[in-house]
Amino acid sequence: MDERGNRENDFLNQRTRQQGTVRRPGSSDQRPGSSGTGEYRTTGSRQTTQHDESWRGMSSQNQSASDTKDGTSWSRESAGNRQRSGVNTTGQTRSGGADTGAARTGAPRAGASRTKNTGQRRGSAGTPQGSQRPRRSRSSRARRRRRNLLIRMFLLIVVIVGAIGGIFVWKRYGPLKEKADLEQYYGLTTEDTLALVVNDQVIKGEDGDHVVGKMIDGEPYIEYSIVREFINERFYWDPNESIMLYTLPNGNVSVSVGSEEYTEVTEKKSEDFIILKTEGRTAYIALPFIQQYTNLDYSVYKNPDRVVVTSEWGTIQTAVLKRDTEVRYQGGVKSPILTEVKKADKVTILEDEDDWKKVATADGFIGYVKTNALKKATEEKTSREFTEPEYTNISLNRTINMAWHNVDNAEANSYVLQTIAGTKGLTTIAPTWFSIADTNGNITSLASSDYVNYAHQSNLDVWAVLRDFHGGINSYEETYEVLSYTSKRETLINQVIAAALQSGIDGINLDFELISGECGEHYIQFVRELSVKCRQNGLVFSVDNYVPQPYNGHYSLEEQGIMADYVVIMAYDEHTEGSYEAGSVASYGYVEQGIKDALKAVAKEKLVIGVPLYTRLWFETPKTEEEIEASEGDAANYANKVTSTAMGMDEAQQILQAAGVQAEWNDTDKQYYAEWEADGGIYKIWLEDAASLEEKLKLIKNNQLAGVAEWKLGWENSSIWDLILQYVN
């Protein structure tokens, strides 16, 4: 064999080892042991092979394919395997290494052949098959099925995720259709409980068990404390004597429990319903009866039972609905629905919150509506025909300059002329004559007709003072015991009026300083009733008050301003004997603020300002360790212990002279101030003198108030009367 032949044999042997049986061109030999092999023919330069049908149609570019079946791995090489020197190589390699040529899944059909030279497929007779579409192997179809399945699964997942996301977004941002629990909204506790809406406010009790109203025999009844707080505070209920009162300018309206009849001053009247019902000590007043004495309208609605009351009149904002919509408990689509409103319904606008407006419906729902559901808001004036009772007053045609005269015993009355001898410009003197002797309403009286005569001769009116201390009772509890009974108040008033008329005085000055918060409603009822008696008897009625503070609001300054002829603000005792720190009796700022606050409740024509004619000398020492440990409450916040002594103007000046101290002007407090060390501590004093008094008189004049009152006669320096005269006509 020549050299070329050797090389060719070596190449063929190598290929045989790699791919299986190989035949040279022109050879008719067949490899022994081959099962299912084809016939190898040679026609000229073209070699035709009858081989596995599974290879038909495979692209000449395919290099290999891997299938897995029953754990067996197969490798295939396409029919377009390399040809060198006209040799056609076709083989199968099983991972096990033996080429059997046996038919497997996709085994070749007999007579199939492939042509390598031309790239055209032919049949067994050499007919071209290029026009026939090639078949795909099962593995290719499986891959496509898997690919399609993956696509479908992906799309399904996208749809599911989208649906879940949509549900989440809807639940989070979509409008809630849930209805609010109206029984909870209105605070209804029992079947006969009546919900109450007053002036666009849902009224609930202080706790869950407090019933604000009841529907009884077809009539709405409102609980007494709710009536006082939200509708008309002039109604008064006495649980001790089971009587309800309403004070008119000339007398009381009185109603007994369970009755259709009532008395208006002296006239007997009746209704066709029971006016007052009770459960224990709790009273319920029929709303139609309340309406007789109150400027109000009301409407009753069902499901749930509720009554809508309007007692405030004036300008309001209203708007008409553009479309049907819901009123929600709060602003936002996730808030529960209170009620549904229709297109063209009118609502009252209470608050504007951009996208939502707080509104009140005519039937008593207070909630929120989308702004875009409302037409433009308009102003509307509301009113109701009603004649308010006129509580007439006595108004003196002069500026009041009243001085309190502290009278502790009958003998003190004899010094009245000496007491007023050095005064100038006084219009009124107020002796402390009347005190409550006991808890039955009896009084102690120091009234003297001689005193009155002396005062009248000096052109002074006499307004006798009635106090709830110094003379019998002297505690909050005792004052409450007297004022909380209608019969005891009546006894007290009748005795005072009788003593006043007997002595010939000109007025009553009420000075009750032991009124607790619990006693407030009884105290103001006493003021009403006493004002009626003073009005009927031509007596000037004035009432003394502390400087207005949040803790003494139960004195009802506004109601006093209606009932009384004059309201006096005692603008002193800023610091008292019981104070934990030293300070002024009446600094400028204290008096100024007191005037401002009082004017919020009382007309300036009725307001009189009390000023001090005294001061306090303070002595301040550091607390010992034992005293610090023993301190309780507010006292624990102060490191020093203080004591004080009240004294008049002249005595204060004498103290300064004895100490060799010069007081300096404090422009903040607008009074002279001094301090010095002695006796192991520090003395401090804020002087009340002509200079400080003038600053207070300027406030009174600038605010055009009714006048001034001084506490007390005998503590003043005589020079102050000329000063006061400049500010009092």
Predicted regions and their residues:
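N-terminal targeting leaders characterized by basic, low-complexity, disordered sequences
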Residues: 1-140
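Primary recognition of N-terminal secretory signal peptides and signal-anchoring hydrophobic helices
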Residues: 3-13, 145-353, 382-395
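SH3/SH3-like beta-barrel fold
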Residues: 246, 344, 357-361, 369
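Glycan-recognition patch characteristic of GH18 chitinases/ENGases
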Residues: 379-495
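Glycan-binding loop/region signatures in secreted carbohydrate-active enzymes
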Residues: 382-384, 471-472, 615-696, 728
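Conserved, mostly hydrophobic/aromatic
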Residues: 429, 510, 567, 609, ...
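Active-site groove signature of glycoside hydrolases
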Residues: 433, 491-522, 569-574, 578, ...
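Substrate-binding surface in catalytic domains of secreted glycosidases
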Residues: 439-446, 494, 517-654
